From Swiss-Prot:
Glycans are attached at N74, N135, N142. Transforming growth factor beta-3 proprotein: The precursor proprotein is cleaved in the Golgi apparatus to form Transforming growth factor beta-3 (TGF-beta-3) and Latency-associated peptide (LAP) chains, which remain non-covalently linked, rendering TGF-beta-3 inactive. Methylated at Gln-293 by N6AMT1. This is Transforming growth factor beta-3 proprotein. PROSITE patterns: TGF_BETA_1, TGF_BETA_2. It comes from Rattus norvegicus (Rat). The lineage of its organism: Eukaryota, Metazoa, Chordata, Craniata, Vertebrata.
Length: 412
């Protein structure tokens, strides 16, 4: 009993000491020059490791990047930004070990055809639904290594719409059979019919994986209005034989008039960039020879929104821009020219700033046993991927590198 009382008094004394010395931390604060040097070397190793390269490729002799390659790079970067925003809202993070290695990016535009080829015959053509077909056979041999697939379509305003909002639903088209449904539901969205243009993204990973494994199952995707072929009165009653019209319009599908002058070929390429397309992230087989380095990450805490706007002295994310040419001496990366890698820095005060009871216990235990373990340090918590465009010889490549941008930090 006496021993327990002595331990309790020691803990209380330590708590009081920690309250007085809130800025105490055994993690040494490094100068910026030293931090940047270490961060640059870490990034150099990370990029080469994720690409499974032992040394940087030779700079390409190509000075002009084709428009289609730049369009793929821009689409991928926009998609990753959207995906990160969705994960933040849902407080979810990917945990697959395959997340570590770089992914090859493939873009497949919708197969263009006559108007009736993009519509279904269940309801009057062009009124209630649109069909989108894609040829992904070129990556079938690597189908089992699909990491993620996104269907993207650009909604454009419809000034002549009679309603301000309409619900659309995305389906995978299945082979007709009397025992199964013709469609498989993927997702739905309530959208404005007017307003400004916006990209819509749907996760179609499972659907595309099925297409890659069984080519005959690739019958396309369909966007239709909710409860097609009926119009509803304000009280909810159905008006038979009166069809609700799809008033949501999509770029590259609804035959909008694009009047313009100049080089028609250039205009066509620019319009193709906004047409419906699939973006596939594939893991090359040679990058799956050894296990990745993925892991769980918790919800963001000390992020860029807070740290970049406040003069926080304790643990926070700090801005750090890496220029590929100046800092790494690399000329083989065409896009981007550099990026904000950022880093975590600042002391981790006991009790007040530690975000978990675990960190507090570590601090107290370290005071009791200074030789036994390390105290909490400021480390990355949430990281974002980076998209790069580079050449191997004359072959352009667009790839996604995971966990390259520090977005938030924590004491651990």
């Amino acid at each position: 009993m006496k021993m327990h009382l002595q331990r309790a008094l020691v803990v209380l004394a330590l708590l009081n000491l920690a309250t007085v010395s809130l800025s105490l931390s055994t993690c040494t604060t490094l100068d910026f020059g030293h931090i940047k040097k270490k961060r640059v070397e870490a990034i150099r190793g990370q990029i080469l490791s994720k690409l499974r390269l032992t040394s940087p490729p030779e700079p390409s002799v190509m000075t002009h990047v084709p428009y289609q390659v730049l369009a793929l790079y821009n689409s991928t970067r926009e998609l990753l930004e959207e995906m990160h925003g969705e994960r933040e809202e849902g407080c979810t993070q990917e945990t697959s070990e395959s997340e570590y290695y770089a992914k090859e990016i493939h873009k497949f535009d919708m197969i263009q055809g006559l108007a009736e080829h993009n519509e279904l015959a269940v309801c009057p053509k062009g009124i209630t639904s649109k069909v989108f077909r894609f040829n992904v056979s070129s990556v079938e041999k690597n189908g089992t290594n699909l990491f993620r697939a996104e269907f993207r379509v650009l909604r454009v305003p419809n000034p002549s719409s009679k309603r301000t909002e309409q619900r659309i639903e995305l389906f995978q088209i299945l082979r007709p059979d009397e025992h199964i449904a013709k469609q498989r539901y993927i997702g739905g969205k309530n959208l404005p019919t007017r307003g400004t243009a916006e990209w819509l993204s749907f996760d179609v990973t499972d659907t595309v994986r099925e297409w890659l494994l069984r080519r005959e199952s690739n019958l396309g995707l369909e966007i239709s209005i909710h409860c097609p072929c009926h119009t509803f009165q304000p009280n909810g009653d159905i008006l038979e034989n009166v069809h609700e019209v799809m008033e949501i319009k999509f770029k590259g599908v609804d035959n909008e008039d694009d009047h313009g002058r100049g080089d028609l070929g250039r205009l066509k390429k620019q319009k193709d960039h906004h047409n419906p397309h699939l973006i596939l992230m594939m893991i090359p087989p040679h990058r799956l020879d050894s296990p990745g380095q993925g892991g769980q990450r918790k919800k963001r805490a000390l992020d860029t929104n807070y740290c970049f706007r406040n003069l926080e002295e304790n643990c926070c994310v700090r801005p750090l821009y890496i220029d590929f040419r100046q800092d790494l001496g690399w000329k083989w990366v065409h896009e981007p020219k550099g990026y904000y890698a950022n880093f975590c820095s600042g002391p981790c005060p006991y009790l007040r700033s530690s975000d978990t009871t675990h960190s507090t216990v570590l601090g107290l235990y370290n005071t009791l046993n200074p030789e036994a373990s390390a105290s909490p340090c400021c480390v990355p918590q949430d990281l974002e991927p980076l998209t790069i465009l580079y050449y191997v010889g004359r072959t352009p490549k667009v790839e996604q590198l995971s966990n390259m941008v520090v977005k938030s930090c924590k004491c651990s």
